[in-house]
UniProtKB/Swiss-Prot annotation:
Gene3D superfamilies to which the protein is assigned, alphabetical: Classic Zinc Finger
Bias (Basic and acidic residues): 273-290
UniProt keyword Glycoprotein present: no
Annotated positions of the Asymmetric dimethylarginine modification: 836
InterPro entries to which the protein is assigned, alphabetical: Znf_C2H2_sf, Znf_C2H2_type
Modified residues (Phosphothreonine): 728
Disordered: annotated span: 244-306, 690-741
Gene expressing this chain: Znf574
Record-listed Phosphoserine modification sites: 164, 301, 721
Protein name: Zinc finger protein 574
Function: May be involved in transcriptional regulation.
Domain of life: Eukaryota
One term under GO cellular component: nucleus
């Protein structure tokens, strides 16, 4: 079965249906067998003049050029001359010409061939050898054959052999058809005419047999998958050897040279859908193989059974079967009875199989896998699934694939034949992968094409240490090359081969398609036992149940951050490893996730892939386009948050909405076992317990890790504690505050996470990495850009439930709701005036600051004036007293007089 045919399988109501003819099947194996009829085969027609007596093999070997052109038309070839015909009717007429040439001249002329309706090259009709009636299906032919067997059960047609099989050469060897030339005996022939003469044979019947299943070990062909799988099991050693049976007469009998020549199967080239040209020998001298590739059984006399012995029928109900295995199963139903399903009327041979089938109707899954959380209806299915978690699966292929089921493993091995997928060679480290980007998706479709990002080849393995293999993309190490190959195929490969027939979405695994189909049908068969919420897959249910338990089983060993999914943890580890394999060719920026590189790519082109058909706007993500179409053009917002009143276009957006009001009303059910403190989530409890562990047994926690900051609209003023009002302190001495988290090198501010620090650093650096594509204004955070873009789009998703007024930001809605409630939670500590919003309080506080600054400036001016006057007074008082000295002219007669 090719990969194209596997993509056409749908899964509806726990059954398989063929997309070509809408026929339902109960198992995957049945629909795979049925899909072979829809696969276009390679048919050939030889154009040119056929030279009688020259076969196709000799013509192809000699290269004379009589058959030069091969076109895909025919699949029926004459074994006498090698000529290819278009239909069984043409082959029938052609074979009658050979009979006329071989018959003597005085023989009675052959009857004209019956009028056979034209058969297409792809249709297979079954013809009765007694009355030459045509049937379109094998079941109708079998039921018709029973009427002849009941009338003459011992009468068997004796075939006449025209010639030996012709082995095709390479040009036409790719289309091999198993054709049986069987002839009826003349009506007047008695029992003595075991083999009629050629002259007496006047009519001929052509039966076309397709052997679709070929053993890769011994090149033996089979028609039914049950016989093929039964034969494949013979190539594998049994776990407990059975006792050797005594030699029968068949084993001791020495075959004749004719038997040995015919019974030896000639090796044929392997192919995915190979056929075989052969001529069944049904006379007593030569023994061929039955239509299932097995030798016919012998009787005690050593003679080969004819057609009557090969056609097995039940002696109780005269039902005809094609293999002894089917007959044996049918006879057991007569001995032990059957058990019928009351819902679908299906019959089962044992009560256990009926109970297992009834579990499929009820969709009950009582057996849960402890490793991945998947649920199964039976314990056998769970045990088979648990083998997939073991390091050594039961069946492994050299190409790297591993299988728990032998049937799927045998089907997979057929793909490695000639013309199939070759086996991988010795692991060779690949070169540096080159990244190519596609053109932006057209505006009509609105589809987003993923770029051809680098993928790990199946054979790429880099030995990091003796006996270990390292992945080149994520640096994970594996002990075996098969484990590395499996990891690269399912983790890093972007190939999605399985397609949803309804919406066209591609998936990596067929099980993902089955889970995805439930989104179209609305089926949610997996309810949560805690809250009764239904889910469409067991994995989603197991992931949801972690929200009830608060468990995060996947924890990072570097930073201690916990996750609910292992894939999220693996992506998180790439950040610590500084491994960014996806690089932008234009700006050189590297990313550790491919979709981030894809979104970054559109920033360079300036054109977003998802365009609205009603307006010229485009979006980076599909969900943004869907929200835009629902809210703006359709005006639909049916989902509303009961806590904050925010309206959303879908239930998914409502579930993703994290309402701070609901979080504040939620009870705190997680209690610390050390100090008795209760928190609202398991993550906060783990952070609180980690703080106890870091503080030590004898220390007291001075400060809890900072909780996520709420929006300004949802902040409420914190009332001072009674201890602070009374001015008393606790008896226990307060321990010094412990530094937790990274610190800003500019302002020495502490943060709880590295992400918060990176956002804070943009204040110092002035970086604004989120520009608006409409007006060019840049922002430091993506949430700010998201709120800003609603100004351009006109979206107002937050509506008031009282008056119907809508807002673009949830903070504005919270402020507006206080108009109806009359709440004013923000009060001024200076004058006691209260406000509805923090921004109004902030504006009011500025007036107090201005008044305070004016008063301070006035006080400073008065102080400066007073200081200046005081300085002047101090300077005047500090001047020393100076004695005045009067100087008069000296008289000759008078002496000097100094006034004291």
């Amino acid at each position: 079965m090719t990969e194209e045919s596997e993509e056409t399988v749908l899964y509806i109501e726990h059954r398989y249906v063929c997309s070509e003819c809408n026929q339902l099947y109960g198992s995957l194996e049945e629909v795979l067998v049925h899909q072979n009829s829809h696969v276009p085969q390679q048919h050939f027609e030889l154009v040119g003049v056929a030279d009688p007596g020259v076969t196709v093999a000799t013509e192809a070997a000699s290269g004379t050029g009589l058959y030069q052109t091969l076109i895909q038309e025919s699949q029926y070839q004459c074994l006498e001359c090698g000529q290819l015909l278009l239909s069984p009717s043409q082959l029938l007429e052609h074979q009658e010409l050979h009979l006329k040439m071989m018959a003597p001249q005085e023989a009675v002329p052959a009857k004209p061939p019956p009028k056979v309706p034209p058969l297409g090259s792809s249709a297979i009709h079954y013809e009765c050898v007694d009355c030459k009636a045509l049937f379109a299906s094998q079941e109708m032919w079998l039921s018709h054959r029973q009427t002849h067997l009941r009338a003459t059960p011992n009468k068997a047609p004796a075939p006449v052999v025209l010639g030996s099989p012709v082995v095709l050469g390479p040009p036409v060897g790719q289309a091999r058809v198993a054709v049986e030339h069987s002839y009826r005996k003349a009506e007047e022939g008695g029992e003595g005419a075991a083999v009629p003469s050629v002259a007496a044979t006047t009519e001929m019947v052509t039966e076309v047999e397709l052997l679709l299943y070929k053993c890769s070990e011994c090149s033996q062909l089979f028609q039914m998958p049950a016989d093929f799988l039964e034969h494949q099991a013979t190539h594998f050693p049994a776990p407990v050897p059975e006792a050797a049976e005594p030699a029968t007469q068949q084993e001791t009998q020495v075959p004749s040279p004719t038997e040995a020549a015919v019974s030896q199967p000639e090796p044929l080239p392997a192919s995915d859908h190979s056929y075989e040209l052969r001529n069944e020998l049904r006379n007593g001298e030569a023994i061929g193989r039955d239509r299932r590739g097995r030798k016919p059984r012998r009787n005690n006399s050593g003679e080969s059974g004819g057609a009557a012995t090969q056609e097995l029928f039940c002696s109780a109900c005269d039902q005809l079967f094609l293999s002894p295995h089917q007959l044996q199963q049918h006879l057991r139903s007569h001995r032990e009875g059957v058990f019928k399903c009351p819902l679908c009327s299906r019959v089962f041979p044992s009560p256990s199989s009926l109970d297992q089938h009834l579990g499929d109707h009820s969709s009950e899954s009582h057996f849960l896998c402890v490793d991945c959380g998947l649920a199964f209806g039976t314990e056998a299915l769970l045990l088979a699934h648990r083998r997939a978690h073991t390091p050594n699966p039961l069946h492994s292929c050299p190409c790297g694939k591993t299988f728990v089921n032998l049937t799927k493993f045998l089907y997979h091995r057929r793909t490695h034949g000639a013309g199939g997928v070759p086996l991988p060679t010795t692991p060779v480290p690949p070169e540096e992968p080159a990244i190519s980007f596609p053109e932006p998706a057209p505006a009509e479709t609105g589809e987003l094409e993923a770029p051809e990002l680098p993928v790990c080849e199946e054979s790429s393995a880099e030995p990091a240490a003796p006996g270990s293999y390292r992945c080149l993309l994520c640096s994970r190490e594996f002990g075996k090359a098969l484990q590395l190959t499996r990891h690269q195929r399912f983790v890093h490969r972007l190939e999605r081969r399985h397609k949803c027939s309804i919406c066209g979405k591609m998936f990596k695994k067929k099980s993902h398609v089955r889970n995805h189909l439930r989104t179209h049908t609305g089926e949610r068969p997996f309810p949560c036992p805690d809250c009764s919420k239904p889910f469409n897959s067991p994995a989603n249910l197991a992931r949801h149940r972690l929200t009830h338990t608060g468990e995060r089983p996947y924890r990072c060993g570097d930073c201690g951050k916990a996750f609910t999914q292992s894939s999220t943890l693996r992506q998180h580890r790439l950040v610590h490893a500084q491994h960014f394999p996806y690089r932008c060719q234009e700006c050189g920026v590297r990313f550790h996730r491919p979709y981030r590189l894809l979104m970054h790519r559109y920033h360079h082109t300036g054109e977003y892939p998802y365009k609205c058909r009603e307006c010229p706007r485009s979006f980076l993500l599909r969900r943004l386009l869907e929200v835009h179409q629902l809210v703006i053009h359709a005006g639909r917002q049916p989902y509303r948050c009961s806590s904050c009143g925010a309206a959303f276009p879908s239930s998914l957006r409502l579930r993703e909405h994290r309402c701070a009001a609901a979080a504040a009303q939620a009870p705190r059910r997680f209690e610390c076992g050390t100090c008795g403190k209760k928190v609202g989530s398991a993550a906060r409890l783990q952070a609180h317990e980690a703080a106890h562990a870091a503080a030590g047994p004898g220390e007291v926690l001075a400060k809890e890790p900072p909780a996520p900051r709420a929006s300004r609209a949802t902040r409420t003023p914190v009332a001072p504690s009674p201890t602070a009002l009374s001015g008393t302190t606790s008896a226990a001495p307060a321990a010094p505050a412990r530094r937790r988290g990274p610190e800003c090198s500019e302002c020495k501010k502490l943060f709880s996470t590295e992400t918060s620090l990176q956002v804070h650093r943009r204040i110092h650096t002035g970086e604004r990495p989120y520009p608006c594509p409409d007006c060019g204004k840049a922002f430091r955070q993506s949430t700010h850009l998201k709120d800003h873009r609603r100004l351009h789009t006109g979206e107002r998703p937050f509506a008031c439930e009282v008056c119907g007024k809508a807002f673009a930001i949830s903070m504005r809605l919270a402020e507006h709701r206080r108009i109806h409630t009359g709440e004013r939670p923000y009060s001024c500590p200076d004058c006691g005036k209260s406000y509805r919003s923090f921004s109004n309080l902030w504006k009011h506080r500025k007036t107090h600051q201005q008044q305070h600054q004016a008063a301070v400036r006035q006080q400073l001016a008065e102080a400066e004036a007073a200081v200046g006057l005081a300085v002047m007074e101090t300077a005047v008082e500090a001047l020393p007293l100076v004695e005045a000295i009067e100087i008069y002219p000296l008289a000759e007669a008078d002496g000097v007089q100094i006034s004291g």
